[in-house]
Every structure is written in structure tokens, then in C-alpha cells.
């Protein structure tokens, strides 16, 4: 309830938040690319950009107003006609009034990226404790003590100089142990990955990432033989069930 209330109250700060989010995303993209370059991580990364497509003039004009805010945050996008859309992605049908193309965007297989990043981290001395249940985090003087249970032992206590909480929706629970308040809430998304097993399907599937605002879906090409489609945001708490109706 508190998250939803704060979420609704933030609508009055839409312009400011949009600009700040864009700036943060651009910086994040720079740092991620640096990590990829430094570590030599291969994860089917493609620098073909992303294409936002619109089927009605009303949507397209709204996108123009949004684009003005994105530009204030430093994001460069190009306004396109229908013919220009088909030039960038010839595999689309001719049924759009216009679009916006972000050339600087990229896509990749995030599972490959994170798993290979973990291996790089371990090679550099990082110790991962998998399947650990954190019971408490306490700051004692200049030290941080973390107590956790593991499948092989109980009430293990480790001491650290610093603690960085970066645990997705679990950050709320961990920050509370330190007297902090991180008011975030899980939103469940759905995606399917379509295999492209032959040359015909590989040639017909779009190469450029696509975002259809009306249909609320985004697509990405993962290498030459996979096509991912994601969409739907479901506010369902910590429920991990996959609803068949959502997939359909």
C-alpha cells in the first residue's frame, strides 16, 4: 500500500523523474559497455538500436512530446516516416504512421552476460555464497557482520568492512535490518523466446529491437537463431506463478 501511494504521488514529478531516469540509464549503459570491453564478455550483443513503432497519429504525437523530455536527458532519437521504418527493418509490414529510432541502443542475452560476469568475478577473487538465507545484518563499529544459513551449515557469521545492498526486491528486507527504508515492490514481467531453427525463419524475423507501445511488447533478436518477445507488467507481489493466459 505504501509503495502504491508513493508511486501515485510521483506522477506530479513525471517530467523531472523522466529526465533523471534517462540520464541514469545513459551512464549505466556506458559503465556496462566498459565492463564488457574490460572483461571480454560475449553475450550475443547487437548494436542495431531499437525502433519504437506507432499505429495511430494520436500515439505518434504523444511520442513526440515524450521525445522532447528524453532529449532533455541527453537521449538522441530520430523521428521516422513509415518508409524510413521499413528501410531500417524491412521485415515489418507496412501499417505504421511513424516511429522513433534510437541508434545508440543495444540488446543481448542477459543470462549469458550475468553468468559470464560471475565467472570473471570469481577469477578475480570474488566468493559467491549460493543458496544462503541471510538472517541478520548488523553494523558494529567499523565492521559489518552478516549472519546467514546455508545448506551445509547454520548461523554462519561473516565480517566485512562494507556492505552493498543490491538484491532486487529483497533489498527492502535487507535495508530494514540496517534501519533504512527502500520502498520498492516487485512487478512481474513475461517473455517468450522463439527458436529460429532454419534459414527461412532467421531471414523473416526482425533484426532490430522493436517496441510497440499499443501492444505493450518489446522484441529482441538474440544471436541468429533466437527471437525474444517480452511484455505485460503484473503487480502480483512475490508470487512467482506463470499464468498461461498471460503467455497466450
Report the location of each language-model feature.
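Rossmann-like flavin
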Residues: 2-116
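A conserved short coil-to-beta-strand element within the FAD-binding core of flavoproteins
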Residues: 80-91, 106, 127-145
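Active-site substrate-recognition segment that forms the wall
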Residues: 1-7, 136-144, 157-248
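Conserved beta-strand segments of alpha/beta enzyme cores
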Residues: 76-78, 127, 156, 181
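Conserved active-site and cofactor/substrate-binding residues in soluble primary-metabolism enzymes
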Residues: 23, 27, 80, 108, ...
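N-terminal Rossmann-like dinucleotide/flavin-binding domain of flavoprotein oxidoreductases
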Residues: 114-126
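Short beta-strand segments that buttress and anchor functional surface loops
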Residues: 102, 146-150
Amino acid at each position: 500500500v505504501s509503495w502504491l501511494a508513493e508511486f501515485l504521488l510521483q506522477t506530479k514529478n513525471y517530467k523531472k523523474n523522466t529526465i533523471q531516469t534517462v540520464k541514469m540509464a545513459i551512464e549505466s549503459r556506458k559503465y556496462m559497455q566498459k565492463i564488457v570491453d574490460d572483461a571480454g564478455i560475449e553475450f550475443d550483443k547487437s548494436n542495431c538500436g531499437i525502433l519504437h513503432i506507432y499505429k495511430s497519429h494520436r500515439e505518434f504525437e504523444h511520442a513526440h512530446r515524450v521525445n522532447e523530455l528524453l532529449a532533455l536527458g541527453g537521449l538522441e532519437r530520430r523521428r521516422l516516416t513509415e518508409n524510413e521504418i521499413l528501410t531500417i527493418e524491412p521485415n515489418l509490414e507496412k501499417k505504421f504512421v511513424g516511429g522513433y529510432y534510437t541508434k545508440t541502443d543495444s540488446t543481448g542475452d542477459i543470462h549469458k552476460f550475468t553468468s559470464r560476469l560471475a565467472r570473471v568475478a570469481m577469477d578475480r577473487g570474488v566468493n559467491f555464497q549460493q543458496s544462503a538465507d541471510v538472517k541478520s545484518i548488523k553494523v558494529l563499529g567499523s565492521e559489518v557482520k552478516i549472519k546467514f544459513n546455508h545448506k551445509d551449515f547454520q548461523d554462519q557469521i561473516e565480517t566485512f568492512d562494507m556492505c552493498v545492498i543490491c538484491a532486487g526486491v529483497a533489498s527492502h528486507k535487507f535495508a530494514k535490518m540496517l534501519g533504512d527504508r527502500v520502498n520498492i515492490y516487485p512487478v512481474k514481467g513475461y517473455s517468450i523466446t522463439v527458436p529460429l531453427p532454419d534459414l527461412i525463419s532467421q531471414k523473416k524475423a526482425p533484426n532490430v529491437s522493436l517496441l510497440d507501445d499499443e501492444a505493450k511488447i518489446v522484441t529482441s533478436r538474440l544471436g541468429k537463431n533466437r527471437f525474444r518477445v517480452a511484455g505485460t507488467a503484473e503487480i502480483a507481489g512475490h508470487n512467482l506463478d506463470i499464468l498461461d493466459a498471460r503467455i497466450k
